């Protein structure tokens, strides 16, 4: 009986994670953040598995069959996205991460090219308080920016090394940018990841507009 209950709970968590991935994809598609099948979304099921979108599917019309159940300690499953290693590395590094959402939105794609690589510092925006741990617009928010790289295993190692370093004198963002590519954002739950994604993308829009009117 105990075994049956455990299996039922595992199945319930898996179904919930799949539903959250589908909802995240639909929300991003409505905002036009994932054009032409771009982007990928994942939600942690348990300590060893995540639900993650497969390659080449429209994120606005995901079906349960478009979601892979990927073990964290196993090779990538067939039909996996080339960017799956970037998700898996973060889940392995930080057990507190419950969901990771990646979009190719205009603001993050353009602003990341302007920055190039290094760090984007955001300061003075009230919306920064939507990020977990930030309580004032006076706190600086540091978003790491990396050069885009088609070798995502190598890129995952670079990201991990940079995150270990932290952000001196600023609050580390729950996300990072790939130049000319887009944003990865995460949170302790799918709801928090969605809030962080929306907040960061909106902050990038603010920053782009502000830079147009300042030398």
Give the residues covered by each predicted segment.
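Glycine-rich flexible loops
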Residues: 2-215
């Amino acid at each position: 009986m105990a075994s049956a209950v455990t299996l039922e709970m595992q199945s319930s968590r898996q179904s919930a994670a799949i539903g959250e991935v589908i909802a995240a994809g639909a929300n991003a598609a409505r905002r036009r953040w994932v054009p032409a099948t771009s982007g990928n979304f994942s939600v942690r099921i348990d300590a060893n598995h995540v639900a993650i979108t497969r390659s080449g599917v429209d994120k606005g019309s995901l079906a349960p069959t478009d979601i892979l159940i990927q073990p964290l300690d196993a090779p990538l499953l067939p039909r996996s996205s080339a960017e799956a290693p970037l998700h898996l590395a973060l889940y392995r590094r930080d057990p507190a991460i419950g969901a990771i959402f990646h979009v190719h939105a205009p603001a993050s794609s353009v602003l990341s090219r302007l920055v190039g690589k290094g760090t984007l510092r955001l300061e003075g925006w009230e919306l920064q308080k939507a990020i977990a741990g930030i309580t004032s617009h006076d706190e600086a928010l540091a978003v790491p920016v990396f050069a885009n790289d088609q070798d995502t295993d190598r890129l995952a190692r670079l990201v991990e090394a940079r995150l270990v370093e932290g952000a001196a004198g600023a609050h580390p963002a729950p996300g990072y940018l790939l130049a000319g590519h887009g944003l990865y954002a995460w949170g302790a739950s799918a709801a928090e990841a969605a809030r962080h994604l929306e907040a960061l993308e909106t902050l990038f829009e603010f920053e782009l507009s502000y830079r147009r009117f300042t030398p």
